[in-house]
Curated annotation (Swiss-Prot):
The gene is atpA. Coiled coil: none annotated. GO terms for molecular function: ADP binding; ATP binding; proton-transporting ATP synthase activity, rotational mechanism. F-type ATPases have 2 components, CF(1) - the catalytic core - and CF(0) - the membrane proton channel. CF(1) has five subunits: alpha(3), beta(3), gamma(1), delta(1), epsilon(1). CF(0) has three main subunits: a(1), b(2) and c(9-12). The alpha and beta chains form an alternating ring which encloses part of the gamma chain. CF(1) is attached to CF(0) by a central stalk formed by the gamma and epsilon chains, while a peripheral stalk is formed by the delta and b chains. It is found in: Cell inner membrane. It comes from Actinobacillus pleuropneumoniae serotype 3 (strain JL03). ATP binds at residues 169-176. Keywords: ATP synthesis, ATP-binding, Cell inner membrane, Cell membrane, CF(1), Hydrogen ion transport, Ion transport, Membrane, Nucleotide-binding, Translocase, Transport. InterPro entries: ATP_synth_asu-like_sf, ATP_synth_asu_C, ATP_synth_asu_C_sf, ATP_synth_F1_a_nt-bd_dom, ATP_synth_F1_asu, ATPase_a/bsu_AS, ATPase_F1/V1/A1_a/bsu_N, ATPase_F1/V1/A1_a/bsu_N_sf. The record marks 373 as: Required for activity. This is ATP synthase subunit alpha. It is a peripheral membrane protein.
Length: 513
């Protein structure tokens, strides 16, 4: 078969018409320096603040400093093999992490990748780590409780759903123990939990995960890990990743609780990054935006309205509010709450639980200092029973502290003072609680009732603990239905008061303690 020149030219023209080249514009740059996990890049003209930059070897960096001639970026992961002259490119994406129910019961790193050896995670999608917090109109007041299971906290420093309650204290005062117990207490409450471990030893984190599993709370919890061996960038971003995972539940009309353990280490990691990026240092060498670092994170914890949830789910969920409750932890040095980061976080949060090393060392655990611990919005969320019965607890402890200081110098005290001192000592003893033993509302109400109405006055101080244990065992075995109903409702009326009175009086008559 022979083709003439006309046919050949027509064929070529047809092929040219069919030929389609898809052009794709990419912003590329060159690494000009690498040091301590920070790279400087030349040539990225269109990069955004916080954008992911693709590096050789399927790694990413995040652009943090946008300067006139270069971009300062922090590498997410190992950087030892990066060198000057390597080519990098913009992705046009902000850092996102996987979210969804498939993360519950799993241990993940800052990027949401599983590190527990249980296989891949079945996530429901991805969410940006940096999200603008809900506005004032989208929020609702805090009026539902989060029961921590601790008598001292639920009675004097109550926490509500959507609240930010700071746990602050020196090292080794039980901050993590309090937060872990709060998570364990939620295993039957329907509240999903996220535990973010920042800058901690891997052995400590493994112990926490084991304890959660032992007490049946891990199935309801996501553990986000940025251990001490991780880069400063991953430690800085871990709380935002955990928050994005918690917002998934909040925005779908569910309740979630997130623990940041601890934000002091996150601030130190951010300081390290900022100094390496040559940003100007301020007080205690922290950068000027360290307040914003924590405020933009903690403002994302909120109780959102049913309208917000309905809008977010496109009408799939109606008439349901959602909440994300935050328990940030801050470590102080020698009880100095006036340092830079502690004062910042105190001013951002809705109250603080101050744990004191002197109380901890004297055997009062949880070592809550009731004088300077406060909950600014939680009292509206307290259950009726606890609210009614805990009114005199704080007063009794305040009077006891005042009189105890005075009694050190006075030799002979009148009967009224002696009675107040004795009552204060017994209440202090009653508020002691073992770790991993959260108490339901019904048990707390019964114990507080006994303290409030003078049923402890004739019990020796040394026997308060055994009295409490025996009373609870008696009530749970002989008045099971009443205790279960009270734990569910948390109500308080004359009928419940009479029933509590009957239980305590019958128990004391038996003298089984």
């Amino acid at each position: 078969m022979q083709l003439n020149s006309t046919e050949i030219s027509e064929l070529i023209k047809k092929r040219i018409a069919q030929f389609d080249v898809v052009s794709e514009a990419q912003s590329t740059g060159t690494i000009v320096s690498v040091s301590d996990g920070i790279i400087r890049i030349h040539g990225l003209a269109d990069v955004m603040q916080g954008e992911m930059i693709e590096l050789p070897g399927n790694r990413y960096a995040i652009a943090l400093n946008l300067e006139r001639d270069s971009v300062g970026a922090v590498v997410m992961g190992p950087y030892a093999d990066l060198a000057e002259g390597m080519s990098v490119k913009c992705t046009g994406r902000i850092l996102e992490v996987p979210v969804g129910r498939g993360l519950l019961g799993r241990v993940v790193n800052t990027l949401g990748q599983p590190i527990d050896g249980k296989g891949e995670i079945d996530n429901d999608g991805f969410s940006p780590v940096e999200v603008i917090a809900p506005g004032v109109i989208d929020r609702q007041s805090v009026d539902q409780p989060v029961q921590t299971g601790y008598k001292a906290v639920d009675s004097m420093v109550p926490i509500g759903r959507g609240q930010r309650e700071l746990i602050i204290g020196d090292r080794q005062t039980g901050k993590t123990a309090l937060a872990i117990d709060a998570i364990i207490a939620q295993k039957d409450s329907g509240i999903k939990c996220i535990y973010v471990a920042i800058g901690q030893k891997a052995s400590t984190i493994a112990n926490v995960v084991r304890k959660l599993e032992e007490h049946g709370a891990l199935a309801n919890t996501i553990v986000v890990v940025a251990s001490a061996s991780e880069s400063a960038a991953l430690q800085y971003l871990a709380p935002y990743s955990g928050c994005a995972m918690g917002e998934y539940f909040r925005d779908r009309g569910e309740d979630a609780l997130i623990v940041y353990d601890d934000l002091s280490k996150q601030a130190v990691a951010y300081r390290q990054i900022s100094l390496l990026l040559r940003r100007p240092p301020g007080r205690e060498a922290f950068p000027g935006d360290v307040f914003y670092l924590h405020s933009r994170l903690l403002e994302r914890a909120a109780r959102v309205s049913a309208d917000y949830v309905e809008r977010f789910t496109n009408g799939a969920v109606k008439g349901q509010t959602g909440s994300l409750t935050a328990l940030p932890i801050i470590e102080t040095q020698a009880g100095d709450v006036s340092a830079f980061v502690p004062t910042n976080v105190i001013s951002i949060t809705d109250g603080q639980i101050f744990l004191e090393s002197s109380l901890f060392n004297s055997g009062i655990r949880p070592a809550v200092n009731p004088g300077i611990s406060v909950s600014r919005v939680g009292s509206a969320a307290q259950t009726k029973a606890i609210k009614k019965l805990s009114g005199g607890i704080r007063t009794a402890l305040a009077q006891y502290r005042e009189l105890a200081a005075f009694a050190q110098f006075a030799s002979d005290l009148d009967d009224a003072t002696r009675k107040q001192l004795s009552h204060g000592q017994k209440v202090t003893e009653l508020l002691k609680q073992k770790q991993f033993a959260p108490m339901p509302v019904s048990e707390q109400a019964l114990v507080l009732f006994a303290a409030e109405f003078g049923y402890l006055d004739d019990v020796e101080l040394e026997r308060i603990g055994s009295f409490e244990s025996a009373l609870l065992a008696y009530a749970n075995s002989n008045h099971t239905d009443f205790m279960k109903n009270l734990a569910k409702s948390g109500d308080y009326n004359d009928s419940i008061k009479d029933q509590l009175k009957t239980i305590v009086e019958d128990f004391k008559k038996n003298g089984a303690w």
